[in-house]
Amino acid sequence: MKFKNFLFAAGTIFLTSCTAMHNQQQVEEITDIIQQVNNQWQSTHPEHGRAFWDNAAYHTGNMEVYHLLNDTAALNYSREWAVYNDWKGAKSSNREEWKYSYGESDEYVLFGDYQVCFQVYADLYNIDSNHMPITAGEKSHPHAYKIARTIEVMEYEMSTPNNDYWWWSDGLYMVMPVMTKLYNITHNPLYLTKLYEYWSYANSIMYDTETGLYYRDAKYVYPKHKSVNGKKDFWARGDGWVLAAFAKVLADLPKDDIHRNEYLQFYQKQAAAVAACQQPEGYWTRSMLDAEHAPGPETSGTAFFTYGLLWGMNNGYLEVDSYRPVVEKAWKYLTTVALQPDGRIGYVQPIGEKAIPGQVVDQNSTSNFGVGAFLLAACEMVRFLQK
């Protein structure tokens, strides 16, 4: 019996060792992919564009590359972008003209598409200041200027009586993580209070309690709007933004926050709904519940879903046995279909707000935010294999 136990233990050690070696090989392969994809994007985009959502979403992925690999080239690329934009989003200094409906000019300071950059600035501040907290009125230390505008804008926004700032699903990714990041820097509890208040408003206009999914905005709520086959029309990238937002918020939110369990329940319900409508090939169609509405693969939604699901598995909030097959299929799609031989990321639906029947999305369809989403997913896959 002792000899049999010894053989069993030896076999277990051997299998564990083989698994660890295989995982390490996969980690090295994925690390190479991350660097190939990021180098391809940065080498073909040496200019630093404005601090609008599409560029900023890429930089959230680029910063994840730095956090995972300690890649100073990635760090410098985002830092140079921040400097180019004066550590600001929209640049108006006249608060009387600040707006938060859709707009791309400098008075749209309160619009979330000009606030996702604040996530990147907060991360850069934490790196450069070694996570030095900022108390009310603190401006003396040498890195405070990097988030001075971020704090100015968000604290002005929180001082207003309005709660309808997040009126579209993308906005949850754009700004929810800003609130938790700034809470951790300033320790101002108002960030968490307003996080919940603004999120509650968003839920009231675009959350579908039956499915656990989010409509892109109030225009698309069923039955006012339907897919081509009369179904509820949930836009994959829109729900991808939300699932990724939950992952980022839960990562930063204090464990004793009074609303943490509610965020977690919404996240887990959405994760289950997302997993249930994955296509056999591993991707999600642009209209999640009606594959015929805009058939074929799409990368940005798929990558955000992959990131959001992997984060939950890595942090004990999603059952690995249940979700591993989902992310493995998604990862196979991302690396064998979306990833092109030269490091480009294809099949990214262009900028928009809905699944469009007949819209061409192919291997040549790429964009900054799609690359950022891919990098988020890839970094989280490395962490999964390392565990």
List PLM regions with ranges.
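Bacterial Sec-dependent N-terminal signal peptides
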Residues: 1-25
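His/Met- and acidic-residue-enriched segments that coordinate or traffic transition-metal cofactors
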Residues: 32-50, 60, 89, 101, ...
